[in-house]
């Protein structure tokens, strides 16, 4: 899969799950399961419920995503 095949959308963290997984409510109202990208994990950026984040999603599976940015 090429990098340009991803869908980027903003959302809000609703719930923290085990293994660095999160329930994210997207702007359009859908709720997806998302994990933290390697760069965020590498820099020990904490993500808490209520944080606004950017999520990358594959067009093939719209129920899962990757958190790539946490807004300040």
From Swiss-Prot:
GO CC terms, sorted: cytosol
Subcellular location: Cytoplasm
Domain annotation S1-like: ranges: 1-72
Keywords: Cytoplasm, Initiation factor, Protein biosynthesis, RNA-binding, rRNA-binding
Signal peptide: none
CDD domains for the chain: S1_IF1 (cd04451)
Pfam families: eIF-1a
Gene Ontology terms, MF aspect: ribosome binding; rRNA binding; translation initiation factor activity
Family named by the database record: Belongs to the IF-1 family.
Subunit structure and binding partners: Component of the 30S ribosomal translation pre-initiation complex which assembles on the 30S ribosome in the order IF-2 and IF-3, IF-1 and N-formylmethionyl-tRNA(fMet); mRNA recruitment can occur at any time during PIC assembly.
Purpose: One of the essential components for the initiation of protein synthesis. Stabilizes the binding of IF-2 and IF-3 on the 30S subunit to which N-formylmethionyl-tRNA(fMet) subsequently binds. Helps modulate mRNA selection, yielding the 30S pre-initiation complex (PIC). Upon addition of the 50S ribosomal subunit IF-1, IF-2 and IF-3 are released leaving the mature 70S translation initiation complex.
Protein name: Translation initiation factor IF-1
Organism: Ligilactobacillus salivarius (strain UCC118)
Source species taxonomy: Bacteria, Bacillati, Bacillota, Bacilli, Lactobacillales
């Amino acid at each position: 899969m090429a990098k340009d095949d991803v869908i980027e959308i903003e959302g809000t963290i609703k719930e923290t799950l085990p293994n660095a997984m999160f329930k994210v409510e997207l702007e359009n109202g859908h709720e997806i399961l998302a994990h933290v990208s390697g760069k965020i994990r590498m820099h020990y950026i904490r993500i808490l419920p209520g944080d606004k984040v950017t999520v990358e999603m594959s067009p093939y599976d719209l129920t899962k995503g990757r958190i790539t940015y946490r807004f300040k």
